[in-house]
Amino acid sequence: MNFQNYQCIEFHREGRVLHIKLNRPQQKNAVNEALHLELSRVFVDAQRDAESDVIVLTGNGAAFCAGGDIDWMQSSIDTPEEFERTAREAKDIVFSQLDLEKPLICKLNGHATGLGASLALLCDIIVASDQAKIGDPHVSVGLVAGDGGAFIWPQLVGYAKAKKYLFTGELMSAIEAERIGLITEVVTPEVLEARVTELAERIASGATRAIRWSKITTNLPLKALFHAHFDTGIAYECMSNRTADHAEAVKAFREKRKPVFTGH
């Protein structure tokens, strides 16, 4: 598979392991229009890649993914019709990630927030640096976590804990995330690369079909959940994109102040 047409994502191979790296390090790998479009097709291309059996997803630089790019958020406020296209791409991202038959390991090298957290949590195995934090602060910018977070968090940690984090937008340490079952494993930054390589190579050397079919089977309930409810979640997020509270949150972020929400 040729991945040369990607601009915001880098690729490299180690044997039968394909590494996918979000590559906007100066913006903490925040998702802009270009990266969002590439994410909507990268897992389809990874599935089609005949030279790999395991995929590793990570971020370039100090962060894994800081969620939505603030300039892109402003663009969606200014032209809300564009958010409808974004919503369709969001659906492609989630379902292509769930449809990927190859084991997908997240190397959580740094903070993962919002969409970044959803990208991580929809992976099969999540190995994190103990310096990383994870959370879904959609509500902090006046948005609904309808593009994945509202569905995957309760499946991993239960509704009581999920609602606390989704309603407050609070970030948690990787150590706490491992403790409550949100992620798989936490290691020091010095051994993160080696640990992920060890896991990826072990899985890649296993019974490929049995492993893939085990993943497919395990993902069936998740896929059923997303197929049943994702359209509603993303519709609510589209509605929240048009609210005064969202516009205020983005304006406040740009002005480096705390937003004043009015419930509108």
Q: What does each of the following model-derived ranges do?
A:
Residues 215-224:
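Short, charged, surface-exposed hinge/linker loops at domain edges
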Residues 20, 24, 39, 57, ...:
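Terminal peptide-recognition signature
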Residues 35-38, 86-89, 192, 233:
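Hydrophobic alpha-helical membrane-association signature
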Residues 1-60, 95:
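Conserved CoA-thioester-binding segment of acyl-CoA-metabolizing enzymes
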Residues 225-230, 263:
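Short beta-strand->loop
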Residues 3, 59-96, 112, 142, ...:
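Glycine- (often His-adjacent) and acidic-residue-rich active-site loop
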Residues 3, 95-209, 235-238, 242-243, ...:
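Crotonase-fold acyl-CoA enzyme core
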Residues 25-28, 61-62, 67-70, 111, ...:
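A short, glycine- and basic residue-enriched loop/turn
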